[in-house]
């Protein structure tokens, strides 16, 4: 505020406001506070740089609308003709090991488990995961990397999991592994099996699986300690098995009421 007041005093004459020649920083602060302007703070925003942002967003919302429509038509025991998946990778998950052992809670002394501040990094892994939007099942795989080869391995797993006559629709971003030459070559070996619906650039928030990743970060990964990368992979496998015993169906609501579809699943 001091520098702003000084700038105003130095230039008020040429701007036609000579009365401001004695302006002090306290007055500047009061004026800015009254109109709720805080020039000393910076808020960040993300500019839309994808010229097809709205179109791609609508394509993604159409998928979510199709899911809701299909849910209202099929019965519990019916096999849906299409599998709708939300897919993404979560790279850089650290395997962290304690250097000193955790200390148990002690009544009257320590109400919680005590953990030493120092730890050892054992390396990182990548999570490749798809959520079935119709039944909530999570298809999760832990890999050392997340290149085209790992993505193709995930596609092969999905191809083996779903019946041959089921179309697999996947919402995903345009990561290089998803559009690579290797990936395209694999897709040619399973024609009409997969359909990719890409989120717009800087539109990862449109992908439901990001909600699942956020949940993992807040819960499962928040305080986990392991003795090896292999143990971390095993813990992930146990975690996926547990959540798939009682899967949660994620639902999208934002702007979904603006999407209108005619049923293509009915017999009429």
Which residue ranges define each predicted feature?
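Charge-mixed, compositionally biased segments that are often intrinsically disordered regulatory tracts
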Residues: 2-7, 11-121
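Electropositive, glycine- and tryptophan-enriched low-complexity nucleic-acid-binding patches
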Residues: 106-166
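Active-site proximal helix-loop segment of RNase H-like, two-metal nucleases, encompassing DDE(D)
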Residues: 209-231, 244
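C-terminal domain-tail junction helix/linker
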Residues: 231-268
């Amino acid at each position: 505020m001091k520098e702003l007041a000084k700038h105003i005093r130095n230039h008020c004459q040429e701007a036609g406001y000579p009365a401001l020649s004695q302006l002090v920083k306290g007055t500047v602060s009061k004026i800015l506070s009254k109109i709720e302007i805080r020039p000393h703070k910076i808020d960040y925003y993300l500019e839309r740089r994808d010229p097809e942002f709205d179109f791609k967003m609508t394509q993604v919302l159409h998928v979510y609308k199709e899911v809701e429509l299909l849910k209202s038509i099929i019965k519990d025991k019916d096999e849906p003709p299409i599998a709708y998946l939300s897919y993404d990778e979560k790279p850089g998950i650290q395997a962290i090991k304690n250097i000193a052992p955790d200390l148990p809670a002690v009544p009257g002394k320590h109400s919680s488990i005590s953990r030493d501040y120092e730890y050892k990094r054992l390396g990182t892994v990548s999570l490749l995961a798809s959520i079935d939007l119709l039944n909530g099942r999570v298809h999760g795989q832990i890999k050392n990397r997340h290149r085209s080869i790992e993505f193709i391995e995930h596609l092969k797993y999905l191809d083996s999991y779903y019946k041959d006559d089921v179309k697999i629709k996947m919402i995903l971003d345009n990561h290089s592994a998803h559009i690579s030459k290797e990936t395209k070559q694999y897709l040619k070996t399973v024609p009409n099996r997969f359909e990719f619906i890409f989120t717009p650039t800087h539109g990862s928030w449109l992908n439901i699986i990001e909600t699942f990743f956020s949940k993992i970060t807040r819960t499962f990964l928040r305080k986990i300690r392991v003795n090896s990368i292999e143990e971390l992979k095993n813990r992930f496998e146990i975690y996926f098995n547990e959540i798939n015993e009682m899967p949660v169906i994620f639902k999208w609501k934002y702007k979904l009421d603006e999407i209108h579809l005619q049923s293509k699943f009915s017999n009429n």
